Amino acid sequence: AKADPEDILIAIHVSNRGPETARLDLLPTVWFRNTWSWDGGTERPRLAVAGGHPAAIAISESTYGDRWLHCEGRPTLMFTENETNAARLFGVTSGPRYSKDAFHRYLIDGEHDAVNPEQIGTKAAARYQLSVPPGRTVTVRLRLNDKRPGLGALAEKDFDGLIAARRREADEFYQTILPRSLSDDAARVARQALAGVLWSKQYYHYVVSDWLWGDPAQPSPPDDRRRGRNHQWTHLYNADVVSMPDKWEYPWYAAWDLAFHCVPLALVDPEFAKEQLVLLLREWYMHPNGQLPAYEWALDDVNPPVHAWAALRVYKIEEKRRGIGDRAFLERVFQKLLLNFTWWVNRKDAEGMNVFQGGFLGLDNIGVFDRSAPLPAGGHLEQSDGTSWMAMYSLNMLAIATELARENPAYEDVASKFWEHFLNIAHAMSGGRLHGGEGHDLWDEGDGFFYDVLHAPDGTRTPLRVRSLVGLIPLLAVQTLEPEALEQMEGFSRRMRWFVEHRPDLTGNVACMRTPGHRERRLLAILDPDRLRRVLRVMLDEQEFLSPYGIRAISAIHRDHPYRLNVNGTEYRVTYEPAESSTGLFGGNSNWRGPVWFPINYLLIEALQRFHHYHGDGFTVECPTGSGQMMTLGQVAT
């Protein structure tokens, strides 16, 4: 909690839930980010025992001035350097005398000479040796501020009173954020989730040119690094506070993770959410060709294009809460996403036929092969999810253009562009089925499901019949057009009517273009009512995708019936794996072969709601499949 912008109060509560007294060492730690080891020109900051105050750490840095960490009681203060233990890691004799692993070595290995006896360094900890009785809680208080040590810094009454006041203020704030319909338990879960995403902000510093050529004060990297990964991203200069998937296990941004983060962030900090979405589109992130950086390990990889969706959701959330939307933000994002959309069309459509690839697309090991690597037999994958993401992207851009056209008619032309893109993609996914089209049908009529298709060098095409989210993502490409918007956009409406009349080969592959639905809405979707029912029959089957906790990433039928494919004498296999991954793909700690992934479930809920907005209460499906219980799509979504 903060007393003021320069005064941070820290209370650490240690609870013993067991039946016996427990002893432990608690080490609140303060350190400087290492900025001095790389270019040789940066002054080293300093931590030391505050003179005359053995329970306070003096913090000195040339740019930011002096601070102090006040520690309750009489802990043992330990100091070392925030530098790598080169001897242990690289087996060299040179390196710092005191290294960042010193506290572990001191406590666990008994190496008392691992810490600096002069009590100075760039990393420090206050060691508390605690004994906590069963069922009791011990509290340790610290305070970080710009005030010299003295009496009263940790006075318990004032300290605890201020934290209690900040807690009340936080309670009042979240009462304005969370729906009143939530139970107390659900509200706590929501607050914990929002706290988690706020806590995962991190300063992220990655300069590709520095990484390729090395730091001035360090040994030069091998020459092949300059021809390796990320060598085409020399413009990338990241030095910003960024929302991370997790500051410990995943301390780097991923393009689509960040977009998803921004939607809940918009509830508590809409300005930060907007800044994050704009940041990834700036010139020092986005490639000059329009590609968004995927993540640091391989900036060239491709995440699903959900940036437009997230920007519109953030815009709508702020508009609902404040009564007015930030149109300047929406326009900034839209203008830059035009570049990204064009990159997708030019780079990820191998045959120029509106059937897209994209590689792993964030779904890691969901495929038969590593979809980011060359295929074992050559050729390419026509991806159901890649194509569907682009259909959704087209509709998201159409929705943004429609919103902006309310005040600027110039956006009507751009709305028409994205509407026509969507028509072409929907046409391609169905193989132009109404007019005898061939060659690109990702829909399997027999199974009532969408699959990736392996397109071999000899022209043969093999559907990869894995029941996975790859076949459900076509559901996400859905948008309704309100009659009021169509009336206002006269030019767009004329163009739409012309297409319906003169290009039935295209409009016939889009759900319900000719027929107004509930409240005269128009529907743009890949799935017509028949295909919608067939896909939902699979998705809502408890033996397949529907679990007690959401929609699985892969159908449970693959538990007993793995998918197998033989290519050049090698068998490839996909099995339902609801827990840990059995493959080493993408580090081995990422599993898309069974677990429920919340962001995709969120998008599926949103898609069902949109279908319901068009079809209304007259359209029902069996949920769960085989139960005899009929529900509207709105009921299924909830």
Predicted regions and their residues:
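Acidic, mature catalytic/reactive cores of soluble proteins
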Residues: 1-638
